[in-house]
């Protein structure tokens, strides 16, 4: 699952730094803007089978690759 998350982030951010630094802030580093954030939520639904409305999660909750992976694990476990 972690590999799938990292692949998704690498594709969305168009940068492999997301694999190298799991604590990089995706927004602060200019890797993911607000549109990218929404696209990430849509792609997570497609890949992992859970839906998340943009109002259900704040950017700060999933602002690094490590936090995105933790969020996905939590949501998949709840299915």
UniProtKB/Swiss-Prot annotation:
Pfam families: PP-binding. It comes from the Bacteria. Residues 1-76 form the Carrier domain. GO terms for cellular component: cytoplasm. Keywords: Cell wall biogenesis/degradation, Cytoplasm, Phosphopantetheine, Phosphoprotein. GO terms for biological process: cell wall organization; lipoteichoic acid biosynthetic process. PROSITE patterns: CARRIER (PS50075). Pathway: Cell wall biogenesis; lipoteichoic acid biosynthesis. Its main location: cytoplasm. 4'-phosphopantetheine is transferred from CoA to a specific serine of apo-DCP. It is found in: Cytoplasm. GO terms for molecular function: D-alanyl carrier activity. InterPro entries: ACP-like_sf, DltC, PP-bd_ACP. The modification O-(pantetheine 4'-phosphoryl)serine is found at residue 34. Belongs to the DltC family. Carrier protein involved in the D-alanylation of lipoteichoic acid (LTA). The loading of thioester-linked D-alanine onto DltC is catalyzed by D-alanine--D-alanyl carrier protein ligase DltA. The DltC-carried D-alanyl group is further transferred to cell membrane phosphatidylglycerol (PG) by forming an ester bond, probably catalyzed by DltD. D-alanylation of LTA plays an important role in modulating the properties of the cell wall in Gram-positive bacteria, influencing the net charge of the cell wall. NCBIfam families: dltC. This is D-alanyl carrier protein. It comes from Abiotrophia defectiva.
């Amino acid at each position: 699952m972690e590999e799938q998350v990292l692949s998704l982030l690498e594709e969305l951010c168009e940068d492999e730094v997301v694999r190298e630094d799991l604590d990089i802030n995706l927004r602060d580093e200019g890797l993911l803007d607000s549109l990218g954030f929404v696209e990430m939520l849509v792609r997570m639904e497609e890949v992992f089978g859970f839906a998340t409305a943009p109002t259900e999660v704040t950017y700060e909750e999933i602002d690094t690759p490590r936090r995105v992976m933790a969020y996905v694990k939590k949501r998949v476990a709840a299915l």
